[in-house]
Amino acid sequence: MKRLSTKILVLVAALTAAAAVISFAESADFGARGAEGKSGLTVEQMLTYSIQDEYLARAEYELIIGEYGGIRPFTNIMAAEERHIEWVTELFDEYGYALPADTAGRHVVLPEDLKSSFETGVQAEIDNIAMYESFLKQDLPADVRDLFERLQGASENHLRAFRNNLNRYN
């Protein structure tokens, strides 16, 4: 019985740790994870995944800041996410597409500690960069290509910031 209890505790601890690293809920069709592996997307679909991912990052970092305080780089990156949302919104307007509602709050989970928060940031930026790499392989209008390149570059900067902070824990 004691051995079974120990195994159950180990399993619960492992599942908790895994959930902390993957704190962006794994929605089937939302943000970068929703776009993963899809090809032949329209500009509207790509912009939708893009803004969902920006909404998702903002919601996650708001949650982290609310729990752990206004620490960098979360505060800086959350401000950047606001700008990114504005940029994507401008193209929705320009192309006459309906702007998706921000439902990102349904897709985030609070990481258990700051280290897990930085791990979450690292994974989110990796997913975001991969999404834009995929989009940039498409034939895109110049303004959309420019936007995706700027957002990908910003994600590369955010990834560096999260990795630098995560390295303090290792």
Tell me what each language-model feature is.
Residues 1-10:
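Bacterial N-terminal signal peptides that target proteins for export
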Residues 10-20:
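Bacterial N-terminal signal peptides
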Residues 20-29:
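Bacterial Sec-dependent signal peptides at the C-terminal "C-region" and cleavage site
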Residues 28-170:
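All-alpha RGS (Regulator of G-protein Signaling) helical domain and cognate RGS-like helical scaffolds
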